[in-house]
């Protein structure tokens, strides 16, 4: 079973997160940030991951710590669930449309953390969510998931659609990359023999 359970407590957030990479897209999300709940719900659905997240964060300050720390915890969960990464496809990419928006994402589950985030979100907020926090989420995730992630906005003018599109695109990309390749089910997908 490729599952993980993360408990991450700091002075700023208390996070409980469960992940099943081979799920059906079920989720139970309660972060205290409505827009982030929506993004994580659709991430689970489009990636076919089962995901439970609760967070008690210092949202009276702002949503920065909650958003970044959940990204960190989700990255930790992916690393734990993947183990030594035996048999995974490793790579994935998706070009995903959402109305006027078009998002490209590509991943290499390489063991090397790198984020290239190229999105031009036209407003500072979607509801009460600071749009710059989307990049903070992916930065935290990428660091702890130990993977290379490229997210590029190819088109789009609606801030909600752009962020929504990134979460859906990355979810589908990760779904493909973590899939087991039956032809190499017992092998590490690297000439080095380790990822």
Where are these regions (language model features)?
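N-terminal intrinsically disordered, cationic/polar leader segments
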Residues: 1-195
